[in-house]
Amino acid sequence: MALLHSWGYKTISIELLVKAIQQGAEIPIRPIILTFDDGSETVYTDALPIMQQYGFTGTVYIVYNYIGAGLFMDRDQIRELHAAGWEIGSHSLSHKDLPSRPGKQMDEIDSSRRRLESYLDVPIRSFAYPFGAYDSDSLKFVKFAGYIAAVGLGDISVQSSENIYYLYRQSVTSETTLEAFVQFLPWKP
């Protein structure tokens, strides 16, 4: 986070990115979106305080069935993230590979949004495909369910209206070296 901050990066939400793509909304000079999948409690205990030190916010994609289970955030923690300026998105009901469940995709996509909005009382505007896996039905159901965008995984840093329902992200884990992370960044000092 210190590196991103020192290089002038500013966090934005998926919603702002969509407005910039579709309506020409203004975004900072070096925008970055920091996303976290699944809803691990470490997002609340570790990522939130560190990111707040640098004035950063993130987008967390919640698996509805994981809320409050084991090492996942509970309702209050997720709502605190939202109150701190974080965007909350859906990561499905049960984190299953969607294309391998053709009869369940719509429920995984649509019900997760409706249940999250009802349970958390926060808007759910974007979706993250579990494992980055999708097919033409997944895209159709995400649009039908009322999401404004969806994210997956990939190497392309240029986002456009052509891929609004499969915006690309880089996967960064505890094993990602600083050198590898820097290679993901489009703007360097």
Task: Walk through the language-model features, giving the residues of each.
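C-terminal active-site subregion of NodB/CE4 polysaccharide deacetylases
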Residues: M1-T35, S40-Y44, H95, P99-P189
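Short, well-structured secondary-structure segments
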Residues: K10-E15, I33, Q52, F56-G68, ...
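Acidic (Asp/Glu)-rich catalytic clusters
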Residues: L48-F56, M73-S90, K143, S161
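Acidic/histidine-rich helix-loop elements
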Residues: Y64-Y66, L71-F72, S100-P102
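Charged helix-capping and loop-helix junction motifs
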Residues: L71-I78, Q105-I109
